[in-house]
Amino acid sequence: MRWPPWASESQARDKQDEQNQKNWDKSLNAIDWAAFTEPRTLIPTLILTTGIIGALQIHRRYLRRFPDAVSISPSYFRKRTILGQVTSVGDGDGFRLYHTPGGRLAGWGWLPWKRVPTAKKDLRDKTISVRLAGVDAPELAHFGRPEQPYAREAHEWLTSYVLNRRVRVLVHRQDQYQRVVASAYVRRAIDFPIPFRRRDVSYEMLTRGLATVYEAKAGSEFGGPELERKYREAESIAKRKGTGLWKGYRRNRKGWESPREYKTRMGLEEQSQGKGN
């Protein structure tokens, strides 16, 4: 039986519609790779990708905050400085620093979400313990040990000089007490004759006779031979003038005791007492 002519035409149209639908679906699912290589697409994509990668690198290199000494990358040692605010001064040659990467330019101090905490509970596990490089200050009373002469004066001076101030530290290394041994620098508005001159905190303590050059057999760190010479010269001048803890040094050398000698004597006494028990 032959189908009417119009039936064949209808079947042909259906097949054509079905083929057109398949072609349409295929075109929707196909990826036009050529479009990605067109300048109008390629250039904005490259700019956006480069911008994102650059922003991540800047954040990682300049704006990442270190909460404690252990978090500081060894790549910083002797190469890069860390800016922060001193939140407490524990003794005559050490303090705690709250890292503020980028400083005021990054919003620290004036943006509401970038303020240095003041409460102790908010500062817990969020500060870097800094040990001043190249110097040894007299020991305060602690762990049952008596206070050394000029220990309080050294602590009070350091507190007045750096507490709540912005300080920049050059980290030399970490020590066994989870601190960083670092050179610390501070700028003060009232500084005669040159305001905002950068001051080396360790050097300032030596010139005032509030510390001696660090003399331990191991673990001494100055930040280089040039700084060591500078520190020893400052100590020599203070010693000659009898400044600070050097007062009476010439008259009673045998009775005078350096911070290093004091710690050595205390350690020997404690060992002796331990053996006696």
Swiss-Prot record:
Cellular localisation: Mitochondrion; Membrane
Keyword match Protease: no
Catalytic site positions: 131, 139, 179
Composition bias, Basic and acidic residues: 11-22, 257-268
Alphabetical UniProt keywords: Calcium, Endonuclease, Hydrolase, Membrane, Metal-binding, Mitochondrion, Nuclease, Transmembrane, Transmembrane helix
Listed EC numbers: 3.1.-.-
Membrane topology type: Single-pass membrane protein
InterPro entries assigned to the protein according to its UniProt record, in alphabetical order: SNase_OB-fold_sf (IPR035437), Staphylococal_nuclease_OB-fold (IPR016071)
Main location: mitochondrion
SUPFAM superfamilies: Staphylococcal nuclease (SSF50199)
Residues annotated to bind Ca(2+): 136
Transmembrane spans: 42-58
Sequence ranges assigned to domain TNase-like in this UniProt record: 80-248
Signal as UniProt keyword: no
Annotated GO MF terms: endonuclease activity; metal ion binding
GO annotations of cellular component type: membrane; mitochondrion
Disordered: annotated span: 1-22, 257-277
Pfam families per the UniProt record, alphabetical: SNase
Family: Belongs to the LCL3 family.
PANTHER family from the UniProt entry: EBNA2 BINDING PROTEIN P100, SERINE_THREONINE-PROTEIN KINASE 31
Name recorded for this polypeptide: Probable endonuclease lcl3
Source species of the chain: Aspergillus oryzae (strain ATCC 42149 / RIB 40)
Lineage: Eukaryota, Fungi, Dikarya, Ascomycota, Pezizomycotina
Gene: lcl3
